[in-house]
């Protein structure tokens, strides 16, 4: 097992829990990356949010529920270290990583070895999972590229700033979750909101566009961004109003300091640690240089005197052309002893990466026992995401091929319902958005039922064997 990020940690845990001895290799702290700050397994380098925990209405919340059913270490650690975040599952990042580390170090079947794997694993390693993540070291990345004769794709993830809570001016800002939504561990007032007038917004956008950005290296200049983690200044470049329809949208919130005036835009900050002393700026990933960041972000009402625990940063992210290179069980077609997991495979997000680590671990455990394992049903979140990675996306409706892109879990990856719901329990017809809600709930219910059937048929039988 190479790489002790979220996917690698989850894969190692699944293998060990299945009775398979695991050697887990992690290059940190011997060799650090541009984004990591610690040597702890499962370090969160971007947001501290695992996004929505609503299993009935949201695809990522459904993925949470499926992973919990499968004994996920990552979800167990997240649940034990959650902080208030409205309808989302957010975690104390240090507590979360420490919990994962404690579990791995305490498992009798897991040996954690420090040191970099600088090329392909030795040929006598016959059951290997590579989960080295978006910042795979150059020697290993080049070895993989040489083996596959495929140029890895790459994009950037930008890191959002974190602010000390006690430096936020609450005479201008206020606590409220959008639409007062209450989530796991939350109260409905979990975000700090900073309002902007039209003039303030116009000035802010102009400053973002003019601010000095981080210089690219030659090999980074043509690297595309992933839309799910765009730097805020790149969003601003796409249109003056883009931010007002994205992370700064002023909907579902009322300023108690001036309740009769609707803000033109709103900046939200989300709790970042369990103590509640740190808050991250939601959606404010950035590649601005440090000086301009402080100057520009302190023009936000309520943040004039903000002290930053961490400023935003930028790192490159790489992933495989998985549908071409990997088989249905995440094995490299050119060398099937090597299996890949996590963000390298073209999934995007903490939960998605960990979930692919989970299924890779189950596949590797079945291989170690000399048995097979059928994939999870395509109707499940895990099966839908796996299907995207291993080729479900590759053809368009007209049969033309298109480039493989990283993907968050979403209901668009699921097979359609045989019969879409049209009526409420009382028999009246569903209208407008009610149909969308009912469809999502039906997809989620089908997914959990099908996953339970798959677990009963395959995993419990395997465990008994």
Swiss-Prot record:
Reaction equation(s) it catalyzes: uridine(54) in tRNA + (6R)-5,10-methylene-5,6,7,8-tetrahydrofolate + NADH + H(+) = 5-methyluridine(54) in tRNA + (6S)-5,6,7,8-tetrahydrofolate + NAD(+); uridine(54) in tRNA + (6R)-5,10-methylene-5,6,7,8-tetrahydrofolate + NADPH + H(+) = 5-methyluridine(54) in tRNA + (6S)-5,6,7,8-tetrahydrofolate + NADP(+)
Chief location category: cytoplasm
Its EC number(s): 2.1.1.74
GO terms for MF: flavin adenine dinucleotide binding; tRNA (uracil(54)-C5)-methyltransferase activity, 5,10-methylenetetrahydrofolate-dependent
Keywords for this protein: Cytoplasm, FAD, Flavoprotein, Methyltransferase, NAD, NADP, Transferase, tRNA processing
GO cellular component, one term: cytosol
Superkingdom per UniProt: Bacteria
UniProt: FAD binding residues: 3-8
An annotated GO BP: tRNA wobble uridine modification
Necessary cofactors: FAD
InterPro entries, alphabetized: FAD/NAD-bd_sf, MnmG-rel, MnmG-rel_CS, MnmG_N, TrmFO
Pfam families, A to Z: GIDA
PROSITE patterns per UniProt: GIDA_2 (PS01281)
Compartments where found: Cytoplasm
Function, as annotated: Catalyzes the folate-dependent formation of 5-methyl-uridine at position 54 (M-5-U54) in all tRNAs.
Protein family membership: Belongs to the MnmG family. TrmFO subfamily.
Protein name: Methylenetetrahydrofolate--tRNA-(uracil-5-)-methyltransferase TrmFO
Gene: trmFO
């Amino acid at each position: 097992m190479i790489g002790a990020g979220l996917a690698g940690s989850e894969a190692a845990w699944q293998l060990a829990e299945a009775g398979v001895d695991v050697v887990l290799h992690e290059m940190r702290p011997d060799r650090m990356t541009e984004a990591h700050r610690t040597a702890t397994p499962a370090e969160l380098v971007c947001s501290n949010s695992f996004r929505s925990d609503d299993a009935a209405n949201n695809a990522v919340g459904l993925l949470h529920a499926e992973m919990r059913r499968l004994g996920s270490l990552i979800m167990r650690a997240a649940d034990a270290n959650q902080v208030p975040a409205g309808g989302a599952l957010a975690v104390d990042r240090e507590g979360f990583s420490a919990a994962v580390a404690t579990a791995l170090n305490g498992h009798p079947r897991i040996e954690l070895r420090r040191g970099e794997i600088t090329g392909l694993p030795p040929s006598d390693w016959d059951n290997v999972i590579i989960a080295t993540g978006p910042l795979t070291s150059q020697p290993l990345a080049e070895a993989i590229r040489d083996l596959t004769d495929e140029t890895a794709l790459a994009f950037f993830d930008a890191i959002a700033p974190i602010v000390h809570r006690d430096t936020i001016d609450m005479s201008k800002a206020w606590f409220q979750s959008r639409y007062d939504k209450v989530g796991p561990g939350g109260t409905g007032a979990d975000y700090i909101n900073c309002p902007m007038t039209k003039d303030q917004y116009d000035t802010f956008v102009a400053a973002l566009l003019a601010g000095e950005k981080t210089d690219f290296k030659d090999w980074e200049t043509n690297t595309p961004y992933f839309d799910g983690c765009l730097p805020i200044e790149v969003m601003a470049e796409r249109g003056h109003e883009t931010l007002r329809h994205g992370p700064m949208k002023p909907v579902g919130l009322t300023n108690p300091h001036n309740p009769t005036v609707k803000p033109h835009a709103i900046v939200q900050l989300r709790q970042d640690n369990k103590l509640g002393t740190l808050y991250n700026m939601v959606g404010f990933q950035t590649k601005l240089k440090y000086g301009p960041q402080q100057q520009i972000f302190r023009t936000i009402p309520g943040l004039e005197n903000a002290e930053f625990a961490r400023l935003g940063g930028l790192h490159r992210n790489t992933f495989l052309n998985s549908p071409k290179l990997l088989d249905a069980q995440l094995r490299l077609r050119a060398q099937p002893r090597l299996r890949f997991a996590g963000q390298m495979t073209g999934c995007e997000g903490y939960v998605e990466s960990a979930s692919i680590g989970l299924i890779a671990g189950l596949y590797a455990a079945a291989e170690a026992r000399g048995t097979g394992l059928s994939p999870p049903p395509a109707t499940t979140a895990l099966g839908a995401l796996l299907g995207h990675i291993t080729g479900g996306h590759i053809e368009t409706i007209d049969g033309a091929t298109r480039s493989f892109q990283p993907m968050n879990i979403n209901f668009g990856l699921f097979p359609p319902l045989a019969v879409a719901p049209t009526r409420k329990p009382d028999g009246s017809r569903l209208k407008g958005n009610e149909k969308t809600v009912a469809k999502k709930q039906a997809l989620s219910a089908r997914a959990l039922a099908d996953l339970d059937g798959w677990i009963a048929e395959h995993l419990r039988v395997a465990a008994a064997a």
